[in-house]
């Protein structure tokens, strides 16, 4: 991991020191200790009756990957959080890289991250583009989405989704907990 080599820290320690700690994201981590496991939201999955039921602990449920400790951490998956913690991260982005006096990113870095870098490679009709980690809304009408030009966000496992709309001074976090998430129109 580049972050580990440059910083001399494990990836989880780097995130804690540079992002999670300064933003006071106290409920965000790569694994849960036994005392926190009971706070984990249940995952639901489609059943054979056309409805939804609580998923088992296997591949569709939360499974053992949430239990720790572990020594390997991914920069692209596996971080557990709460809606309120993740909203703090998004608010930092909305604020141009700062929250409650903690500067995490330079305003120019946030601006670079949230602009379309792929032209029409991501979406051939030009309705949405992709920045450095985010889908960027370029034409709400053509995209069939609510929001302002420049709104950015993405989704994750279990139908989690978030977006930041700078023009409306708004952040949104959805923690649906459904697997697979197909068929949901957020």
Where are these regions (language model features)?
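Short, structured beta-strand/loop micro-motifs enriched in basic residues and often containing a Trp
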Residues: 153
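Short, small/polar residue-rich loop motifs at catalytic or cofactor-binding pockets
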Residues: 156-158
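Short, well-ordered beta-strand micro-motif
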Residues: 135-136, 163-165
């Amino acid at each position: 991991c580049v972050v580990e080599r440059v910083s001399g820290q494990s990836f989880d320690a780097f995130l804690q020191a540079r992002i999670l700690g300064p933003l006071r994201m106290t409920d965000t981590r790569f694994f849960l200790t036994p005392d926190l496991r009971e706070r984990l939201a249940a995952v639901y999955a489609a059943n054979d009756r056309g409805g939804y039921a609580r998923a088992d602990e296997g591949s569709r449920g939360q499974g053992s990957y949430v239990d720790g400790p572990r020594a390997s951490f991914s920069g692209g998956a596996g971080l557990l959080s709460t809606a309120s913690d993740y909203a703090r991260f998004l608010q930092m982005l909305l604020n141009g890289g700062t929250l409650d006096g903690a500067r995490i990113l330079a305003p120019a870095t946030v601006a670079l991250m949230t602009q379309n870098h792929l032209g029409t490679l991501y979406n051939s009709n030009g309705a949405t583009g992709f920045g450095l980690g985010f889908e960027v809304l370029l034409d709400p009408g053509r995209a069939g989405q609510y929001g302002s030009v420049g709104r950015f966000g993405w989704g994750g496992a279990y139908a989690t989704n978030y977006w930041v709309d700078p023009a409306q001074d708004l952040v949104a976090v959805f923690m649906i907990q459904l697997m697979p998430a197909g068929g949901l129109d957020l």
